[in-house]
Amino acid sequence: NLPYAFCEQIGKEIRDISDELPFEIPDSWEWVRLGSICEIARGGSPRPIKQFLTDDPNGINWIKIGDSDKGGKYINETKEKIIPEGMSKSRFVHRGDFLLTNSMSFGRPYILNVDGCIHDGWLVLSGYQTAYDKDFLYYLLASSFAYYQFCEVVSGAVVKNLNSDKVACALFPLPPINEQHRIVAKIEELLPYI
């Protein structure tokens, strides 16, 4: 038993991860692996995509990187839709889920304000709501702290890609939910001055 050791259990093995922790956090906070508090999955693309696109306004939203604004927080609409048959070759995501770009300009987070399907240039993070306030998680994922962790695990010589398993292993601080709300309020109070 090490004093003040931070341990995690993987299978039956318990190991000290104190050396992996980048900084100290308050006693009421804890360190978590992103994959332990949410589901992380990669999108998929029906191919050839042109066979699955539709002009039908009732089609399924086809969420592409181009539907996001660099520096924006939300994806509110899509430019294209796909037919229902495309869903089985893609990944359906829900309003409130997080999307994370996983190639080229990797690691950019967005909160979904629409349901739809995502292609393989996205990772989806869902089921985080029991641990994180969505706005706190957004600011955490948009931070240089998160970006540097992603830079350490990105693969590819020319086109950089984030792997969902590597993202799941990223360590993040988890404050109590009431502290998350206070932190978000302070960030949003100060943002106009930055």
Each language-model region and where it sits:
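Flexible loop/turn segments at secondary-structure boundaries
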Residues: 31, 70-72, 107-109, 192-193
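Short amphipathic coiled-coil heptad-repeat segments
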Residues: 1-6, 187-194
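Conserved helix-loop functional segments at active or binding sites
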Residues: 40-44, 108, 150-152, 156, ...
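Sequence-specific dsDNA recognition surfaces
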Residues: 8, 14-20, 35-52, 66-95, ...
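Non-catalytic DNA-recognition/assembly elements of restriction-modification systems
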Residues: 15-45, 173, 177-184, 192-194
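A short beta-sheet element
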Residues: 64-66, 77-144, 153-154, 163
